């Protein structure tokens, strides 16, 4: 993994992590089911990483933290969910959120070629699929009565403040 290249204008760095879990022992997984496993991982993140996303929304709600850059080592799963939740809080339509999420596939092209060449069965781990984020949204809709309720009640997001900060 290459070192972070953070713009010189960044004035503060706030590490905020969600444990990815130990994916090193792939022997226990049926590698043909990796897409289904990743769908389940997105559901797991929604259900079990709420403290971290609550802190994320606290940070992005503070004007002193704007403008804001957030990222992750791969930048597609945990960060993809964060971006989707933030865009949802800002009132962006889900279709547009999904289009934005799917752009990650384009930006990740080539990044994992050596791994996929050596282990083609790992290819689904190196990209995004709409089913992954759809699984997260389905969980939010069914378990938390929709995105706005999830954001406000589970994550403590101040949607009005976020919209005032990030939209015109």
What is each model feature region?
Residues 1-69, 82-168:
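Cys-dependent protein tyrosine phosphatase-like superfamily
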């Amino acid at each position: 993994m290459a070192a972070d290249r953070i713009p010189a204008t960044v004035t503060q760095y706030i590490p905020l992590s969600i444990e990815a879990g130990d994916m090193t022992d792939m022997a226990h997984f049926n590698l043909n089911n990796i897409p289904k496993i990743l769908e389940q991982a997105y559901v797991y993140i929604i259900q079990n990483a709420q403290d971290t996303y609550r802190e994320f929304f606290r940070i992005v709600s503070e004007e002193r933290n704007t403008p804001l850059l957030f990222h992750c080592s791969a930048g597609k799963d945990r960060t993809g969910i964060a971006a989707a939740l933030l865009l949802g809080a800002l009132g962006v339509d889900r279709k547009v959120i999904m289009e934005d999420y799917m752009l990650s596939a384009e930006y990740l092209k080539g990044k994992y070629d050596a791994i996929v060449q050596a282990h083609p069965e790992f290819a689904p781990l190196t990209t995004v699929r709409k089913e992954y984020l759809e699984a997260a949204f389905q969980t939010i809709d069914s378990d938390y009565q929709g995105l706005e309720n999830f954001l406000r009640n589970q994550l403590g997001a101040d949607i009005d403040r976020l919209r005032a900060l990030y939209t015109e």
